[in-house]
Amino acid sequence: MELILLQKVANLGALGDKVTVKPGYGRNFLLPKGVAVPATEANLAAFQAKRAEYEAKAKSELDQAQARAAKFEGASVTVSAHASTEGKLYGSVGARDIAEAFTAVGLPLEKKEVILGEGPFRLIGEYDVLLHLHADVESTVKVIVQGVP
């Protein structure tokens, strides 16, 4: 299935690229989300007519993501969780907990933007967490997990 991308898609292509994907990926993910359109002559002509509009929108989204990344630069948050005396958490601290903690201190963050490379934290301590704010913008923040008896 050949598609024209209307925005940058990680591991696939950039705005305006004509890509070939498996039919299920195109039909069930890219097309319903409005990320791509079928690569027909009519759609190609319509895309070329609106290319400047799509590029301006992509630039605006990138600028907003970079502004958000600047706010997160050097930011840290403390998350408290019940823990044993050895420092093991009775539960875990995951992406949702981290997103809620940053939102509570005035830095709005969604769960899907938090990237935990090795899964949720199960021990108290300091961790560096990657935030994926845009396809081209990432930021690293510090999360301190404190144990509460």
From Swiss-Prot:
Pfam families: Ribosomal_L9_C, Ribosomal_L9_N
A Gene Ontology molecular function term of the record: rRNA binding
Gene3D superfamilies per the UniProt record, alphabetical: Ribosomal protein L9, C-terminal domain, Ribosomal protein L9, N-terminal domain
Keyword Ribonucleoprotein on entry: yes
Coiled-coil parts of chain: none
Family statement: Belongs to the bacterial ribosomal protein bL9 family.
Name the UniProt record assigns to this protein: Large ribosomal subunit protein bL9
Classification lineage: Bacteria, Pseudomonadati, Pseudomonadota, Gammaproteobacteria, Lysobacterales
